[in-house]
Regions:
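Flexible, low-complexity linker and terminal segments
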Residues: 2-22, 26, 146, 150-358, ...
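Conserved thiamine diphosphate
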Residues: 120-169, 175, 206, 210-213, ...
Length: 601
């Protein structure tokens, strides 16, 4: 096995830059000569395509796709035409793209094709913490796991060599810690890669049963060939140390192992699938006890057990959540191979809890306050507005996945739910996965209301453009989708637009919508208060003498509203943080004592 994990580059052209993991991935793709790149934004992957878009348009085509399947299909099309293609997404996005991935794994590639998937161990900003390595095994494609930003850069470049050598899509798996950690990265120039032209071979590129039956055995043989390649690849790295115990690991877990047990023998696997069997057997034979340290699922551990090798893993290290040096040390200590960490007294002062809230002036705030007053059953979706599931708005009953709200609402109505049934979905999410269930709802004569929360941006992931903004990822003007036109085109007869800042009109519109028999659509239309620029109007103030501490304004959950030291009949009055207030007037509209007024300029 080679003793290096770095991809060789010309020293004369090297430079060192402080890059975040996602920036390093983008840089690696650009250096690899990528010509076609597509993605759908999703934390922790978003910055990859944003950074690729900063490179010249003459170098590569980049796009925000309407969803992850579309993004992967765009990349597959680029590879069919002989160009190096790139796609990125978060882990749950791979669920959406998996239909294409599973077929593409049989077909293979022409130009190199790399798919970067960013997992979210610890569920910082996702619905789950699924493990992409299991998808790679299911699809029969290799998955590389960099452990730091330098490897993120290098592994992407190496992935193209593997992709073209073995005629396969290659997944590069990142994680939240890797994607959002910054470190020094040695970079190089862009490689000039000539396009191979379109692959005119229907027996390979057309996925029909007759072709697929021939290609499946080739996929199996390819897996075996890649496993053999990994035996001597720089991705497989043996660090010899104490033979009392050895650790097989990869990704960021490798760094944790090196921090807590630098003397241990370590087999670092830069590829989590397929595995280099000979290297693993040789390493296992060289140590007294063998451990696998991996985040989330026991993917490597199970493969090693299937080889008949005695190994210890998830019995010692947690299967749920992120790993850390502390957890790795605790697991090894529980195994009796190293001392436990010294007990450190906790901080005497507990840090102040700051639960996530919608921004001051967020247009979604009024929408969900109105929905709560209707006593409706609300199916939610994925976006900033999911925060309305908690107090004080607490008006969302379900949230499953992108686009689930509308079909969930149809199911609730079909099951006989007596309350009004309302689906709430953001503009970007509606374009991502909301159209098919809306068509289905109309076709199947469902009795539901759909509220499209149109804030003219993909806000949750940092303000990315989509087909409803009229701008491309490079800021170029383009066609702007009209939601009312779409809804009417698929058969929705009752469609209304409303400004959520007009609380009274909003509430009346929602009442009319829920009274309509059939599918009704309300488009709550107002730009996000943060994107493209922060909106800042004249702030408001509360006349303390007029405040009767009814606290109705606090039901908005606005972070600009804070408790006052003054009280009225034992209840705290409210103040407005004028630095945070944007002057939306929502609090003034719900104030029962009419004591909230704009501050005079």
């Amino acid at each position: 096995m080679n003793e290096t994990v770095r991809v060789a580059k010309s020293a004369a052209s090297e430079d060192v830059l402080p890059l975040m993991g996602n920036e390093a991935i983008a840089r690696g793709a650009w250096e690899a000569g990528v010509k076609v790149a597509a993605a759908y934004p999703g934390t922790p992957s978003t910055e990859i395509m944003e950074n690729l878009a900063r490179y010249p348009a003459s170098d590569l085509y980049v796009e925000w796709s309407t969803n992850e399947k579309v993004a992967l299909d765009v990349a597959i099309g680029g590879a069919f035409s002989g160009a190096r293609a790139f796609c990125s997404m978060k882990h749950v996005g791979l669920n959406v793209a998996s239909d294409s991935l599973m077929s593409q794994s049989y077909i293979g590639v022409h130009g190199g094709l790399v798919l970067v998937v960013c997992d979210d161990p610890g569920i910082h900003s996702s619905q789950n913490e699924q493990d992409t390595r299991l998808f790679a095994r299911l699809a029969g494609v290799p998955v590389l796991e960099p452990s730091d930003a330098q490897e993120a850069h290098d592994f992407v470049k190496l992935a193209y060599e593997i992709s073209e050598r073995f005629d396969t899509t290659v997944i590069v798996r990142s994680t939240t810690r890797l994607s959002h950690t910054r470190s020094a990265v040695r970079v190089g120039p862009r490689e000039t890669v000539a396009s191979k032209g379109f692959v005119d071979q229907p027996s390979k590129t057309v996925a029909i049963p007759a072709n697929a039956r021939r290609q499946h055995p080739k996929l199996v043989a390819r897996e075996q060939a890649i496993a053999e390649y990994l035996e001597t690849s720089p991705l497989t790295h043996w660090e010899k140390g104490d033979t009392k115990f050895g650790v097989i690991t990869g990704s960021t877990s490798y760094l944790y192992v090196k921090e807590v047990a630098p003397w241990a023998s370590v087999l670092k696997l830069g590829a989590a699938y397929p595995l280099p069997e000979k290297a693993i057997r040789e390493f296992a034979a060289s140590v007294d006890r063998l451990f696998v340290v991996e985040e989330l699922e026991p993917a490597i551990e199970k493969e090693i057990r299937a080889l008949g090798i005695a190994v210890e893993g998830k019995a010692l290290f947690p299967r749920c959540g992120e790993l850390s040096p502390e957890l790795v040390r605790a697991g090894l200590a529980a195994a009796g191979v190293m001392a436990a960490a010294e007990v450190v007294a906790p901080l005497a002062i507990e840090p102040m809890a700051r639960p996530p809230v919608l921004c001051a002036g967020c247009p979604h705030t009024a929408t969900y306050l109105a929905l709560r007053s209707l006593n409706a059953r609300v199916a939610g979706d994925i976006g900033c507005y999911t925060l309305a599931a908690v107090e004080p708005l607490r008006s969302i009953d379900t949230t499953v996945a992108m686009g689930s709200s509308i079909a969930n609402a149809v199911g609730m109505a079909a099951a006989g739910e007596p309350r009004p049934i309302i689906a709430t979905i953001g503009d970007s999410t509606f374009l991502h996965a909301g159209l098919p269930p809306l068509v289905g709802a109309v076709y199947n004569k469902a009795n539901i209301t759909v509220v499209i929360l149109d804030n003219a941006i993909t806000a949750m992931t940092g303000g990315q453009d989509h087909p409803g903004t009229g701008r491309t990822i490079r800021g170029e003007k383009t066609f702007k989708v009209d939601y009312e036109t779409i809804c009417r085109a698929v058969g929705v007869s009752w469609v209304r637009k409303v400004d959520p800042y007009q609380v009274g009109k909003l509430l009346q519109t929602l009442r009319e919508a829920t009274a309509f028999k059939g599918v009704s659509v309300v488009i709550a239309e107002r730009p996000c208060v943060l994107d493209p620029v922060k909106i800042k109007g004249a702030p408001l103030a509360i006349n303390a003498s007029g405040c009767v501490a009814c606290q109705s304004c606090m039901n908005l959950g606005c972070p600009a509203l804070v408790w006052s030291e003054e009280t009225y009949e034992g209840r705290h009055k409210v103040e407005i943080d004028q630095g945070a207030c944007i002057g939306c007037t929502l609090c003034a509209q719900v104030c029962l004592s009419d004591c909230i007024q704009p501050v005079a300029s």
